Structure formats: C-alpha cells, structure tokens
Amino acid sequence: MELKTKYQYTYFIYPYIVDDKKYDKYILKLLKDKKCKFKIFQKEKDLDIYNFFLPNIRNYYFPTFEFRGEVLKEFNKSSVEKKKSIISKQNVACFTYDLAEDIQGKVGDEDGIFFKVEDIEIICFRSGICFFTLKTIIENSNEFADLLDFNYRFKDINSEFLNLKSFENIKIQTSTFSDVKDITELIADITGISKKDKEKRVESIVSSNFYTYSYVCLESNHWNEKTNFDYLESDFLKYSNVLPKDFNSDFDKSNIEHRLHVIEKMKYYKTAVTRTSSNLFCSGIDTYNYTLLPHKYENEYFYTYILGLYKSLFLRKLDDDFKDYDQIIKMRARFIEFSRVLWNKEITVDDEGSLYFNTLSRVLELDECYKDISNKYEVIYKELNIEKNNIYYQIIVILLIFSLMFNTINILVLMYVFL
C-alpha cells in the first residue's frame, strides 16, 4: 500500500561564510535590500522560543528579545547606518526575505511534483558563519513517495556541478522563478557568493549542497496500534537518509543505520539525525503529532538545529585556520570566547529538547572536534611560547654582550685616565 501524508514540510539549509572583516558591510547590504527585513523576536509573539531556551543562550542567540519599549522605537527610527552598527555588534542577526507571494514550483515533467516556497530566512552569526534557509511544502500530492523524490532532488539544486546535469528533474513553473537557475541566482545574490567564489571556498568547511530538515506526518491507518512498524522501516530509512523512492530496497541497512541516530522517546514519532539532515517521521494517530509538534519542530527545534550546525562549522573553521600561521594567534581569542559562551552549556530545560541537542552534538562529533582543536592549539601555542622565549633569550644575550663591552670600555677609559 502506497503511503499517504497528512502534512509535511521541508527546510533546505545552506551555510556560507562571510569574511569577518566584511561582516558589517554584509549586514548593511541586507538592510539596504528592500526585500530583506530584519527579524525582531518578541516575547508575546515568540513565547515558545523565549521559554524553550535558557537565559544565557537566549540572550546570545536572540538578542532582539531585549528590543522593546523605547529601545525598539529608537531602533526603528534609526538610520540604516546606525542599525548596521547596532546589528553587527550582536552575536546573531536574523532576516526574513519577502517573497511577495508564495512561489509555486514543479519537480519533474507534466506529471511532476508541485511545491511552493513558503519562507526564506537568513541567520547570521558575528563570526561570519551564516545560514540561508528555505521552507518548502509539496502541493497537490499526498504521496509519501513524492516527498522522498522531492527532498532527494531539491537538496542538490545549488550544487556547483548542476550545470553539468540535465534540468529534467527540476523545473520551476512560476511567474517569480522561470527556471531552477533563478533559485540558485537568488541564493548567490543574498549570500554574495558567486560561482567564482565557490571555487575558492574551503570545501572542508561548507559545501554547496543543502542540509535537509524535514517533517512528515503519515495518515493514521499506516502506523497505529494494529500495524507493524517493520513494514515502514524501508521507507523510514529512505526518508531519514534523504534517498529517492526507487532506491534499492535491499540496500545495506546496517551501514545506513550506523550513520543514523534515531530518537524514539514517543510511541508514534521518530526523529532521525545524520551529519547532513534532521528528519521527523510521525503518525496522525496522535493529534499532537499534526497540531503542536510541527510548530515546535520548525521553531524551537529548528533553531536548536541551526545552533548545532553553527558549533560544528565554527570548530571546523578554527581547525582550518591552523593552516594559516598568521591566524593562530587571532584564533585564541575566538576559541576562548566560544568556550566561555557556548561550549558545554545546557541550552534548555526541556527534556526532549535536551535529548535532541545532545543527539545532534553526538552525530556532528562536536566533542571530538573540540578536543582535537584544543590539543592542536595547546601544542602549537607551546611551540610559539618556546620560539618567543628563544627570542627573549637571544635578546638578553645580546644585551649582556653589549653590557660587557660597555663595561670593558669604561674600565679601559678609567685605566687610561689614572695612568
């Protein structure tokens, strides 16, 4: 029996890096873009997010919660330049992109999969690590197989190798986007990263493919107290690993499961986390799963996921900085600040939220990466101190030699005078 969906959405997340020396100019660029709007979080409107994150993380991650009353009025009246100065000093800045109308697209040919782009958000950290996020919803289809194919195809549309492929798989039919290239051009325009820049980018830090963050709720007749989840396992693993519907059903499950962490705290929903995706799979047998859960997953959990990705990319960027001798001294302050503010900090008292973040941290191997960087830096810093001490010793020796010469000359002069 073909699986049917009750509700679904997918966020595609593209990380990119802005030179930290140009970060304030990039913020100014977004502020001047008429379609970009600086996002101000408000306690009344975003109460779930406000209550979910602990104060220290909330103050770091969502500084605009403090924008209220006269502070908010003053900010709104400020010039673009002044807003840029305020925003660029904050740890995190969020922008929404005005689509004017929902953008409808199509994957495939005449009988392809219609979808709409519902939301675009830009999340920037002061370190220069940013995220372009795009929310999509499939329309005119409740086939689970269509969701599998859509997620699989769409995650690669920003690939630098896309021009080597046929465009048969993805076609955009809308007055806003005439072709899939329009989406990639929008990404390039917002991020400021051209194809030429992509070639220069360090691929060990970021890639051109999207991270996939997806939610799907199946119709209750597919998964309930009378059904066996074993019949859903193959589809669940394909969904979890962003694989197409026609992927060989005899694939090596043990290998895929080795790279997959599944959270199963509740009976009728599972959250599957890999290094490049976080996908929630649930049943409509429980009304919570299609009422409150999708909202929570695309708000509290979504920002938790972004924070986990940020930590991973920040550490990988620090690791890459070891290649540049001049960066080693500068990275010390960044590493200390990161450790002080974000490392080994609880982000929430919500049990499920903590479980999700801890699982994500384990999948992204954050502890291993942190320890590796800490050990590398300790070794290199000791070497730098040894070099520094050697220089000091050399200077002392030179000064002693000059002192000896000076004293010798003085003695000779005195001897000459008395003689």
In which residue ranges do the predicted regions lie?
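Generic structural hydrophobic/aromatic packing signal, biased to beta-strands
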Residues: 12-14, 132, 271, 278-281, ...
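Generic "edge-of-domain/loop-turn" microfeature
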Residues: 18, 139-141, 278, 286-287, ...
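N-proximal short alpha-helices
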Residues: 87, 287-291, 346
